[in-house]
Amino acid sequence: MTTTTSRLDAQIEKHLGLIDSLSARFALPLHVFFVEEMEANAEAFRSVAAAQYPRTAIAFAVKSNPCRGAVRLAARFGLGADVASEYELQLALEEHMEPATILCNGNAKSDDYLARAVSAGCPIAVDNADELDALDALLRGTGRKAQVLLRFRGMPLAGLTSDDQTTAADWTKFGFHIDEAPALFARLAEAATLRFLGISAHIGTQIAEPGGYERLLDHLLDVARDAQSRGLDVEMIDVGGGFPVSFLSEDEWTAFQASLLARLRGDVGASGAVTWNDIPMGYARTAGDQDSTWIGKAYWSRVPIARMYQHLLCAITRNGRSVVERLHALGDPTLVIEPGRSLMANAGITLTEVMGVKRVLEHAVVSLDMGINNHGTNLISPDIFPAAVLPRRESDVPETAFLAGRLCFSGDMISKAKVKLNRLPRRGERFVLYHTGAYSADHFASNSCGFPRPAKVAIRPGGTAELWRAPETYGSVHGASAEDLTIRDV
């Protein structure tokens, strides 16, 4: 147990009988979410907003856990939604979220997505000029207007984190460059089919240090002021999400970084490897030397979850005023935040079964009855998730191990960083991965190697459960052997 898993361990202990029953009914692997933990995270954001900037709108990033159960909870907790497709939009509307609280995002919105957003009256974060043209063509002559924000990139955020984690610097597929703002504002001021609501940007994901957020907000507030100076009303500023979660404790995180850096510099031998095949993760070589600067996904933050938002509202910007003071000067626009990982990650676990343990170059490798398609964030960047063998025993002797998946390709590693386990397991023992409530179950989920996707269940505080996704079966994935595959009437 680490300090970051103590709450989840308490939930497992509290609901152990129910978890056993759910595991027997739906089989392993099994994604389990705890409603109480998600609600605590939502309440933390609501409390910060109420105390420091009540004109905050909290929009749950549906892509972090795209299922009806999670969206229904978000609606019950009084949240809106950040949606990234027409299907997420439909889900949010079906769960009775107010259209004005559903932010429609995405860099490649279909005509259908745009039409649905306009019909419902949802704000649209416009990504590019073609989207503006598409909206204009859709609405020309109707007397109606689309509610739009302009999404921007090009803020000075280079070196903040790895390229696959940031979405507001220069090298990103999202948004207009901030240099385009004056021309865009001029177009919106004259548009007959577009109603300007405000501006938008999204810094990225799992941003552990506040400095990048401070730079982003500083520039966004400047852009908002420029829009006002050109006669536009700025009713809304959407700063996105990316609020961090501490997967590890501070001591665990700094120890991992120190061990990895020592290995990459050659200070320790092969037995001291802490990543698979010595992948550098957030470290990079420069001019032939091993740089000691970590640029990549971080697994601990001094201001996790809602504490990051609290810090940002109080942050002092370049002109010497706090973010809240500058918002007041702009007329108190609605400030939209889009938490996803920070609401869901530490509300979930994944249970699976151990298939075997072997040694590879002196290192323990635990093979699990799940694949990277059930833990998809690893396909973006190598992740570090705490894990344990169940049940825990007083006689446990801690060991470190790499975690391997069951898919038939060598990149299927559940953890390319060595994970500290309470003991080395045996085949057939139950195994838990912590903090898998966001993205893991759904991001890149697939039927690789013919495996069905596992069930997702949620446990309520009172000890009852919800089925968030039924487990797929052989038949639902592959069909029946007698099925006629001919396409007719085409």
Predicted regions and their residues:
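Active-site-proximal loop/turn and secondary-structure-junction residues that shape catalytic pockets
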Residues: 64-66, 87, 108-110, 128-130, ...
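Distinct, well-ordered alpha-helical segments
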Residues: 70-73, 92-95, 135-140, 161-163, ...
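Structural preference for beta-strand elements that scaffold enzyme active sites
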Residues: 57-59, 78-80, 101-103, 123, ...
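Generic secondary-structure signature for well-ordered alpha-helical cores
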Residues: 43, 47-51, 140, 144, ...
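A charged N-terminal "starter" segment
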Residues: 1-147, 191, 195, 229, ...
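Active-site loop/helix belt of alpha/beta enzymes
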Residues: 156-345, 451
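Charged (often Lys/Glu-rich) extended helix/loop segments that serve as interaction or gating elements
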Residues: 18, 269-490
